[in-house]
Amino acid sequence: MSMEEKLNFQTSQDFSESILKPNNEKAIAETIKYCYKKNIPLEINGLGSKKNIGKNFQSQKTLDLSKYSGIIKYEPEELYIKVKSGTSIKAIKEELDKKNQQLAFEPNDFGSLFDGKSNEGTIGGVLSCNFAGPRRFKVGSARDHVLG
């Protein structure tokens, strides 16, 4: 049994076997541990909004978090939202907008620099890079607004 089968990966037909799409926390953690132990270069990818920034990375495996997305809990009266790391900023903004709320920070949208399409990425990408946009000087960084 291969590692992918063991961890219940759902590999897309459009991608090679080197792209892994786990849909739960256990599979994500076990993939990272496995690649670390075997010294396999691993790229972690959400929507790829920051892929063209910085030095290119040569990896043998890509951990695609697009299947690990969604809003887990939203309490508008408490100004609290819990989401999975692969959740797009667009989806979060749409949910907050329903209750006339917004993110305190303003994630950068690098889409216009690369392909002209808006792409603010995922919450996991924003927090890992700590990009906060033009409001950072007034309201702080993205990580300043995260619990846990």
Segment roles from a protein language model:
Residues 8-9:
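Extended, low-complexity regulatory regions
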Residues 54, 115-116:
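Short Asp/Glu-rich motifs
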Residues 105-106, 116-148:
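FAD-binding subdomain of flavoenzyme oxidoreductases
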Residues 13-110:
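Glycine-rich N-terminal segment of FAD-binding domains in flavoprotein oxidoreductases
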Residues 12-13, 130:
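Short beta-strands and strand-loop turn motifs
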Residues 1-5:
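ATP/NTP phosphate-donor binding region
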